[in-house]
Amino acid sequence: MLWVVLAVVVVLASVLVLLRQSSGLLALLWHDVVHQRLLNFFTGLSRPQRILKAVQKNATKGNPESVIAAIDHYCRHSEWAMNVGDEKGLILDSVVTEVNPSTALELGTYCGYSTVRIARLLSPGTKLITLEFNPDYAAIARQIIAYAGLQDKVILVEGPSGDLIPKMKQQHGIKSFDFVFLDHWKDRYVPDTKLLEECGLLRKGSVLLADNVICPGTPEYLKYVRNDPRYESRYFKSNLEYTKVEDGLEKSVFLG
C-alpha cells in the first residue's frame, strides 16, 4: 500500500513540475508549498538559510554583483525563491538608475536580493530604508547585505509596514521618498501607498515600482494607480522570477 501512495506522490509531483513553468498558480504551489517543504525537511534548513549558504559559498565578499549572480544561479538552477529575479531585476536597475534617488524605500526585504540590487546603484551618501515584517528573513538579509559590503547604505527596519511608515519622518528624518519599491504582501500595496500619501512621504515626481502585479497579481493596486489622476503609470511586461510565467512591474509616477 505504501508503494502505491509513493507512486501517486511521484506522479503528482511530476505533473506539477511539467506545469509549473506555464501556470502561475501551479508554479507558486509547487515552489512555495511542495518543493520548499521537501527541502526544509531533508536539509533541516529554511529556504533563506539555504540561499545564504549559496552566497557564502559562491560569492565574493564585498562584491554586490557576485552576490546577485550567486543568488540568481542558485534560484534558477537549484531552488526557486521570491526575489524580483534576474529578468525583472534589470527593469528595477534601469528605473533606479533613471530616478537616481536621494531617498529610497523598499517594502519587503525578504533575503536582501533586491536590497542589494538597489543599494549598489545608489549615489554616495544615499541610504535605502528597507522594511521587513519577518524577523527570520531580516536576520538572513542583514548577513547577505553585509556580505555584499552594502551595510552602510542600508537601514533595515523590522515590523509591520503599516506601523513603520508613519514613523519615517520622525525616526529617520525623511521628508519624502524619491523612489519606493513595493515587493511585500500584495494586499498591502494599496493601503501602504495611501499611507505614504497621507504621511506626506510622496512628493511630485516620486516613483513607485511594484513587483508581481500579474503573478500572483495585485488587481486592486493596478486599478488604484491607473485610475487615480495623481499617478502616471506604465506596465513593464516580464516573467515571474526564474520561470516562463508572465509577470511584470508597474511604474507609477506621483504627480502630486
UniProtKB/Swiss-Prot annotation:
It is an enzyme of class 2 (transferase). It is found in: Secreted. The keyword Glycosyltransferase does not apply. Binds 1 Mg(2+) ion per subunit. Its cofactor is Mg(2+). Substrate binds at residues 186, 212, 241. PANTHER family: CATECHOL O-METHYLTRANSFERASE (PTHR43836:SF3), CATECHOL O-METHYLTRANSFERASE 1-RELATED (PTHR43836). It comes from Danio rerio (Zebrafish). Its EC number is 2.1.1.6. It catalyses: a catechol + S-adenosyl-L-methionine = a guaiacol + S-adenosyl-L-homocysteine + H(+). GO terms for molecular function: catechol O-methyltransferase activity; magnesium ion binding. S-adenosyl-L-methionine binds at residues 84, 114, 132, 183. The keyword S-adenosyl-L-methionine applies. Residues 1-27 form the signal peptide. Mg(2+) binds at residues 183, 211-212. Keywords: Catecholamine metabolism, Glycoprotein, Magnesium, Metal-binding, Methyltransferase, Neurotransmitter degradation, S-adenosyl-L-methionine, Secreted, Signal, Transferase. Its main location: secreted. This is Catechol O-methyltransferase A.
